[in-house]
Each structure stands twice: as structure tokens, then as C-alpha cells.
Amino acid sequence: MNSRCALVSKIIPFSCVDGPGSRLALFLQGCNLRCKNCHNPWTMGRCNDCGECVPQCPHQALQIVDGKVVWNAVVCEQCDTCLKRCPQHATPMAQSMSVDEVLSHVRKAVLFIEGITVSGGEATTQLPFVVALFTAIKNDPQLRHLTCLVDSNGMLSETGWEKLLPVCDGAMLDLKAWGSECHQQLTGRDNQQIKRSIYLLAERGKLAELRLLVIPGQVDYLQHIEELAAFIKGLGDVPVRLNAFHAHGVYGEAQSWASATPEDVEPLADALKVRGVSRLIFPALYL
């Protein structure tokens, strides 16, 4: 029995966009960045039971019980009104789940998946749970063949990675901007620790994928292409995924930002290729 718990925003039993192959994707609640372009902004914060969402629910799926916001999954229509109203960028639908409870979901899907990806929010803000979950999977004869990945923003310290890497098969990280000033403008934090995390993971052979998000007029990749290309080449044979920003699902000023087109992505790809970065993955979809 493993009763260690985490606050879980969502479980997708079969995902083909959260790492290689078909995977169970576990989204944890809470993030230590505040990205303007976040497509899951309701996973940033954690519910403080303020109750502001309760009277807004058109299906009466929320109520206050003993001072806590309680969600009724039976009557909920998944209209997401509560997500748009929450001042905390949280969700009343997040549930506390134990390692054993998550493992029960994994076992139901095990015949149809190649692994599990823990995402968020930011997975590593609930690091002890992730370590316990991956350890349990690696120690289970029926589950140990599954690969265990994290989708992370890279803010975890070196000490934290040392705890996670023995039971983690790899991490997928975003480098949202090259310069710290640009990165802080986009996310609220600088990117020095993120760059250190990327280097550490590459050195350990655990950097499954580096991601660059093209946001027209907002990112600085091309302005710093020499440094960026040299940085990526120094990581070794790591796949680099070029993602195209779109405004669907974002809040605030990013709703007015232009979506990225092939004409926005291709100049970056060409500039990287010319400088020896050739293992590129292009967007599967432009919106």
C-alpha cells in the first residue's frame, strides 16, 4: 500500500501527444511559472475554497460543504465555467489521489499503453508523489515495462532531479525563450535554472525532448540564434520539437497574440539546420 497523495487535475488514459506512443497522461495541479501562453491555465493554482465559482455553475455541480468547495461529478457537464471564473487559476474539479489510486488507473490501461507521462501544471511541484509513483511502477512486475516520463518546465533544482532520475526514464522540457529578460516577460521567472536542468538531463541521457514554442513577435530565438544553436548542439543527439503557438484555451493578453504559421516556424528551423541542429520535429497541426 502507498498512501502518498497528490492533487490531480486530470487523467487521460490514452494519449498520443504526451510522449512517444500511447501513454497514460497524469496532470498534477499547481505550477511555479505563470506563462502568459499557458493552454492549461486552470492548473497553475490550487483551490483556496473561496467559493466564487459555486454560484456561477449553471448545473449546480458545486457547493460549499464544511467550508470546502465540493464538486459533484455526476451532474457536472464539463462546461468549464468554473475554470474561467476562478481568481486563483485553479479548478474545483482537482482531486486528491494516492499512488495506489493512480496505479489502479494504470493497471486498467496497461495492455494499451507504452508508458505514463506526468505533466501539469508542473509535475515536479509534487515531487515526492512522482518519485513514489514511478518507484511503485518500476517495482511492479506487471507494470515495470512501462516507461515513466515527466513533462516539466525545468525549474526543479539539481537536488530534486537527483531524487527523480533513478526512477524516471526521461523528461521533456520547454525552453520558452533564450534571454532571461524575455523569459521573465513570458513566464514571470528567469530561465537560468531551466538551462541548468536541460544540461543536467542531457548529460545523464534523460532529456527525451527539448521544445521550442514559436510565438510570433514574443520570443527571441532568432535574435539569439548563434547562442541557441550552440547550446542545443552541446546537448548531444536530442530531438528538438518546434511547437506553434495558438490562442485556443489561453487567458489574458495572449488571447490577442497571433497564432504561429509555417512561415513563422520555418525560418527558425532553417536557421537551426544551417548551424548543425538537424533533429527537428515540426508541428503536426497549425491552428
Swiss-Prot record:
| Gene3D superfamilies per UniProt | 3.30.70.20, Aldolase class I
| Residues annotated for [4Fe-4S] cluster 2 binding in this entry | 47, 50, 53, 86
Binding-site positions, [4Fe-4S] cluster 1:
31, 35, 38
Cofactor requirement: [4Fe-4S] cluster
Query: Looking at the keywords, is ATP-binding present?
Result: no
Annotated keywords: 4Fe-4S, Iron, Iron-sulfur, Metal-binding, Oxidoreductase, Repeat, S-adenosyl-L-methionine
* Residues annotated to bind [4Fe-4S] cluster 3: 57, 76, 79, 82
Radical SAM core domain span: 17-284
Q: EC top class, in one word?
A: oxidoreductase
Catalysed reactions, semicolon-separated: glycyl-[protein] + reduced [flavodoxin] + S-adenosyl-L-methionine = glycin-2-yl radical-[protein] + semiquinone [flavodoxin] + 5'-deoxyadenosine + L-methionine + H(+)
Binding residues for S-adenosyl-L-methionine, per the UniProt record? 37-39, 121, 174-176, 246
4Fe-4S ferredoxin-type domain: from which residue to which, for each copy? 38-67, 67-96
Looking up NCBIfam families in the UniProt record yields:
activase_YjjW (TIGR04041)
What protein does this entry describe? Putative glycyl-radical enzyme activating enzyme YjjW
